C-alpha cells in the first residue's frame, strides 16, 4: 500500500519532480552510458546534473526513496537510482479515482 501523504509531500518540491522527470528518460538526460538501463542512474550523475551540493541532492533523494517513488540499488561503491513505476502508477490511479 502506498502512503499518499508522503508522496504528496515528496512531489511538493520542484527539484524532486525534476529528478523523477530525469529518471523517466535517463538516456536523454544523462550523457554517459551506465551499462544495464534496468539498474538505474548513479546518484553522482544526478548530483552532477543538478549542480546542487551533494548533501542537498542526497536529502532530496532520501525523501523520494522514503515515499517509495525511487528504488535504490547499491553496486559496489555506486548507489543506482530508478523510478518505482509500480508506485507511481498506483499513485496516479488513486489521484484519478479520488479527484
Over which residues does each language-model region extend?
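Short, Lys/Arg-enriched N-terminal segment that forms or immediately precedes the first helix
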Residues: 1-8
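N-terminal helix-turn-helix DNA-binding core of bacterial DNA-binding proteins
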Residues: 9, 14-53, 79-86
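Beta-hairpin "wing" of winged helix-turn-helix
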Residues: 66-75, 82
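Short, charged/polar, Gly/Pro-enriched secondary-structure boundary elements
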Residues: 87-91
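Short, hydrophobic-biased segments on the C-terminal half of alpha helices
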Residues: 61-62
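The C-terminal cap of the DNA-recognition helix in HTH/winged-HTH DNA-binding domains
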Residues: 48, 65-66
